[in-house]
Amino acid sequence: MPSRVNAMILAKNDTARDYLGIHPNLDLALERINDAFFATLGTERVDIIPGQCWCTKFTYDTIPDEESFFEAHEKFLDIHIMLSGSERVEVSSPKALTVFRSEPENDFWGYQGEGRVKLTLSPGEFLCVWPDDAHKIKMMVDHPETVTKAVFKIKVR
């Protein structure tokens, strides 16, 4: 098992099971990071345990950096899995950013600022961001492209 807990995870899909045991709700998602599960996803949210763990598939066009913003959560972590296309992502501590929107009832906070970690998420990879990881997603790599991604929402607090 990895020695770091509650830290951003960027890994290949075929290593997802290496992270089992960190949190029981996280295990429910990690066990489903595979092509067989992704093939069952339509456009509707799939509840694994209602209110605790679910997955939704999204298709959208990536956007310029300046049109994106950071988001963070207090109770839920996200796992972003690229199914087709690539997008740029930035991650930062919410403490290093400026909050511009607060929706506690939806476990959502929007932020502006500079990312500390910058990466490209491509098919075959997943990014797990914890409540302490503000994440800026949907950014184009070189030009706008249509991407498809699965996102797990997992209650950890």
Task: Give the location of each predicted region.
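A short, N-terminal "cap"/entry segment at the start of jelly-roll beta-barrel domains
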Residues: 2-56, 67-72
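A short glycine-rich, His/Asp/Glu-containing loop-to-beta-strand
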Residues: 43-64, 75-84, 91
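Short, structured patches in soluble enzyme cores that scaffold and shape functional sites
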Residues: 59, 131-133, 139-141, 153-156
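Histidine-centered active-site/metal-ligand motif
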Residues: 71-73, 135-136
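Glycine- and acidic-residue-biased ligand/ion/polar-headgroup-sensing regions
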Residues: 75-77, 81-87, 95-96, 104-109
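A short hydrophobic beta-strand segment most commonly corresponding to one strand
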Residues: 79, 126-128, 144-157
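An anionic, turn-rich surface loop/hairpin at beta-sheet edges
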Residues: 100-119
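Conserved metal-binding segment of the jelly-roll/cupin
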Residues: 112, 120-139
